[in-house]
A protein has these predicted regions:
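Glycine-rich phosphate-binding loop signature in dinucleotide/nucleotide-binding domains
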Residues: 39-41, 114-122
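Acidic, low-complexity terminal tails and accessory targeting/binding regions
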Residues: 73-82, 88-89, 120, 138-189
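Generic beta-sheet signal
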Residues: 4, 120-130
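Short active-site segment of divalent metal-dependent hydrolases/proteases
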Residues: 12, 132-133
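Short beta-strand scaffold positions
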Residues: 47-48, 105, 127-128
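Active-site-proximal alpha-helix that buttresses catalytic centers in soluble enzyme cores
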Residues: 2-65, 98-101, 169
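Phosphate-handling substructures
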Residues: 60-109, 163-167
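Active-site signature of alpha/beta-hydrolase-fold catalytic machinery across serine-
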Residues: 59, 135, 139
Length: 189
């Protein structure tokens, strides 16, 4: 059995800068550090190349490996109703952006590669982004939008409710892999 903690980055700074360069806020750093106890026994750590994800990973583990494919979904030229539309049609994308299906394939390729690098019995932390993580989970889970304005989702796996609410900063999922195949998921506690 192999285990991955698939975690959303912590709370970012607010400001006007390129998405990939946004750092963690002081509150975000403190929240990430508070996750150390839960994640103290990880054998490996991987991160999106975005600064807020790297900083989250570095608050928890030493020397995270940067995996380009773990980056957030490219939004492109966003429209007002974009967030809901992407869940109504997984192939929907803004001009210049990625669809959830495109992100799902990219994320699944990255995580399958990470699982393939792990030894039996190892645990890894993977820090990424809310939409990228939810897109990956579409490979195995059902995702239902409960409230598009507040970005409330219900995520289920084989009829078992995993999350019913907002996917908060520094929250995540515990994924289990048997013979390198996805076998179970629960919320990260």
């Amino acid at each position: 059995m192999k285990k991955i903690f698939l975690m959303r980055h912590s709370i970012p700074e607010k400001g006007d800068m390129p998405n990939e360069r946004i750092p963690l806020s002081e509150k975000g750093k403190a929240l990430a550090v508070s996750k150390r106890n839960i994640l103290s026994k990880v054998d490996r750590c991987f991160s999106s190349p975005y600064r807020r994800a790297i900083e989250t990973a570095e608050c928890i583990a030493d020397h995270p490996v940067i995996v380009e494919e773990l980056h957030e979904r490219t939004i492109g030229d966003a429209r007002e109703d974009f967030w809901l539309k992407q869940y109504e049609d997984y192939d929907f994308r803004n001009p210049g952006g990625e669809s959830l299906n495109q992100v799902k394939v990219r994320m699944k390729t990255a995580i399958d590669s990470i699982v393939g690098q792990m030894e039996e019995g190892e645990t890894a932390l993977v820090v990424s982004h809310a939409t990228a993580i939810c897109a990956y989970l579409l490979s195995y889970c059902e995702i239902e939008v409960k409230d598009a304005v507040d970005k409330v989702r219900k995520i289920s796996f084989h009829g078992k409710e995993i999350l019913n609410g907002r996917f908060q900063p520094a929250d995540g999922f515990e994924l289990l892999f048997e013979n390198d195949a996805f076998s179970d998921i629960c919320i990260m506690n």
